[in-house]
A protein has these predicted regions:
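N-terminal domain-onset segments
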Residues: 1-57, 190
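Mixed-charge (acidic/basic) macromolecular-recognition segments
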Residues: 3-25, 107-192
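A general marker of short, structured functional hotspots
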Residues: 37, 58-61, 118, 145
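Sequence-level detector for tyrosine residue identity
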Residues: 41, 60-65, 122, 149
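Domain-scale macromolecular recognition modules
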Residues: 52-106
Length: 192
């Protein structure tokens, strides 16, 4: 293989990566408080830590499940599964145009349920990450190298979105708390 041919193959790969990164660049940004950014980070990181092998697009809704202790994002809604649902339904997730995720938890996510307990354990881990990082910049700089390709691309978009939104509001400190699960669940019930 000649050097030219080798570079051509690398360029094609690079073009695809650049296209994916461009597609994951945030749009429709607004300023966010540090608490809003923490909430967006927590729920977005939950979705991005889930297993999925498909390309997601802003504006579409996906279903989140807890399958044998692992988060799994699916194109298939619970009512479409019938008796073959892979695990406990957690809620609906929507990728916003600013590359953050919104999560609407299912009403079955009640206190002391396995899903509730798994979410509390997840939030404990996120709380430790936020406190250990000391700043948004340090937190967002830590790439999720263990994630599959699509999730890494989306994590890059999330980091860019939060950086820009925090810069618009003049915020840079990491909040000492993470969103309370009970608070999030009760806010959703009030909205319904």
């Amino acid at each position: 293989m000649t050097a030219h041919a080798k570079n051509t193959f690398q360029d094609k790969g690079l073009v695809l990566v650049l296209q994916d990164l461009h597609a994951a660049s945030p749009g429709q940004l607004r300023s966010k408080s540090s608490d809003e950014a923490a909430r967006d980070y927590c729920w977005s990181a939950l979705v991005l830590s889930s297993a999925f092998g498909f390309r997601v697009s802003p504006g579409y809704t996906y279903s989140l499940y807890l399958v044998e202790g692992q988060w799994q994002l699916s194109l298939i809604a619970p009512e479409e599964w019938g008796a073959r649902m892979p695990g406990a339904f957690v809620g609906q997730c929507k990728l916003r145009h600013d590359m953050t995720w919104s999560v609407v938890f299912d009403e079955s996510v009640a206190e002391d349920s396995p899903v509730h307990d798994a979410l509390l354990q997840y939030l404990d881990g996120i709380h430790e990450q936020l406190q250990a990082s000391g700043s948004w910049e340090a937190l967002l700089r830590n790439g999720e190298r263990h994630l599959p390709y699509q999730q890494r691309v989306l994590t890059t978009g999330l980091a860019s979105s939060l950086r820009q939104s925090l810069a618009l509001s003049g915020q840079s400190g990491v909040p000492l708390s993470v969103p309370l699960l009970q608070e999030t669940l009760s806010l959703q019930q009030q909205a319904n």
